[in-house]
């Protein structure tokens, strides 16, 4: 089972970010980033020194441009911010165990929330 510890971070000094990505055996791709400085709010939702990270998950489906579709990780955003390593490991475990079923649940929850605000007719 893959975990946060399997991520290999690269520091990008020019943009003040740490980045890592990891594809699970079932095809889901995790993208994890963090900023250098705690006080720079233009950076990702997380700072490397504090061991908090922003995570996105890309599914196994592709859009018309050939890009992987993001999995909606919350009702209002495609990313989760300020995640600790254990949180990311838990999310990885969830996708490794439930994969498409978990993705379908998250998509259904997002669609239901959009209907509450009459946004369901707007394309992502």
State the predicted function of each range.
Residues 10-53:
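Amphipathic, interaction-prone secondary-structure segments
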Residues 49-124:
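Mixed-charge, Lys/Arg-enriched low-complexity segments
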Residues 1-4:
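Charge-rich, low-complexity N-terminal segments
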Residues 6-8:
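Short helix-onset patch at the extreme N-terminus, typifying the N->h transition
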């Amino acid at each position: 089972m893959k975990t946060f510890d399997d991520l290999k971070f690269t520091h990008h000094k020019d943009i003040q970010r740490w980045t890592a990505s990891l594809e699970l055996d079932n095809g889901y791709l995790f993208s994890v980033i963090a900023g250098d400085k705690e006080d720079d709010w233009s950076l990702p939702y997380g700072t490397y020194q504090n061991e908090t990270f922003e995570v996105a998950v890309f599914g196994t489906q592709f859009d018309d441009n050939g890009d992987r579709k993001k999995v909606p990780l919350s009702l209002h955003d495609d990313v989760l911010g300020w995640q600790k390593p254990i949180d990311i490991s838990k999310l990885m475990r969830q996708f490794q165990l439930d994969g498409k079923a978990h993705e379908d649940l998250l998509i259904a929850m997002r669609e239901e929330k959009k209907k509450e605000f009459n946004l369901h007719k707007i394309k992502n």
